[in-house]
Amino acid sequence: MKIEELDVVKLKDGREGAIVYRFDDDHFMFEAKDDYDLKLPTISMSDIEEVTWKVSEH
């Protein structure tokens, strides 16, 4: 699965958010909003369960 900047993904832990930066083919900065604040963790391909929206298709 190819992940691009601005794709929306669902993580295995249930969070959903947008890819805001792609470091390489396996590491990304992920923007997730929770009840308290905006978080920008770095995630890897193994954290991603599915792509729910592809920027290239819109």
Model-derived features: positions:
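Basic/aromatic-rich interaction segments and small domains that mediate binding to polyanionic partners
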Residues: K2-E57
